[in-house]
Amino acid sequence: MIEIIQVREADVPREQLSVTIITLNEERNIRDCLESVRWADEIIVVDSGSTDRTIQICLEYTDRIWTNPWPGMNEQKRVALNHAAHPWILNIDADERVSDDLRGHILRVLETQDADGYRFPRKNYFLDRWMKHGGWYPDHVLRLFKKERGRYAGMDPHDKVVVEGRVRTIPAPLVHHTYSSLSQYVSRQNAYSNASAEALVRQGARIFPLLIPLKTLWKFFETYIVKMGFMDGFHGFVAAMGASFTTFWKYAKSWDLTRKKEHTLTLP
């Protein structure tokens, strides 16, 4: 059973909160992101080498900024976590925004502390449309947790927080502006499929070529039909096609990397 938390106003002491954000060339997104969390007790930014105005914009909101070469999604978020000074952590990405409703719930949580971690739905926008189907919503993410109870244990390029203890659900959404153009989407998915393929190879996963087209077709069918992506109109079709292509490249690239590795090992 999912436990739902309701917010109420109360003027009582609360624990302090550190917001952690990792960045790379996010000048288009970062200001709105920071505005949505400027009420926090501390904002931590770990940048992996931005060449645009990301750092300059961040300095308007916090001086807790570090530069660290990109080690992977989960490791970079661990770096940010280690810099946080307060007992509660809220991790968000540069293209995400804390809604006013979510803010109220978070402040209530910092007063009651009736769990060790909290998940909430993510309201994803794809090409400027709120995607309500195709697996895009409610897309619960666990981003608020006690520092001493949470750790990152995901497989790049996707982060995952594991909390030791009780986890509850907040109904208010985190707003996520994913991609504003198809060019941006294709570029990002190419990078994601590279990282996913490399992770599969590191894990020693065996990729059977005959299964790749089946996985690709299933991803489209699952996204567009099973999860009713068609209800989001042409946006839903584009998203389902994109998901299937990303699945194809993820496994095809993994197969290619494994093939090259085995070929190198068999050279005289």
Regions found by a protein language model. Give the residues of each.
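Short, acidic, metal-binding catalytic loop of nucleotide-sugar glycosyltransferases
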Residues: 35-41
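Residue-level detector of structured alpha->beta connecting loops
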Residues: 41, 62-63, 85, 114
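N-proximal low-complexity "stem/linker" segments adjacent to membrane-targeting elements
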Residues: 1-35
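Acidic helix N-cap motif at the loop->helix transition within catalytic regions
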Residues: 29-31, 52-61, 101-102
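Conserved beta-strand positions in the Rossmann-like core of class I SAM-dependent methyltransferases
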Residues: 44
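Catalytic-site signature of metal-activated, phosphate-bearing donor transferases
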Residues: 78-82, 87-92, 99-261, 267-268
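Conserved donor nucleotide-binding strand/loop of the catalytic core
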Residues: 55-83
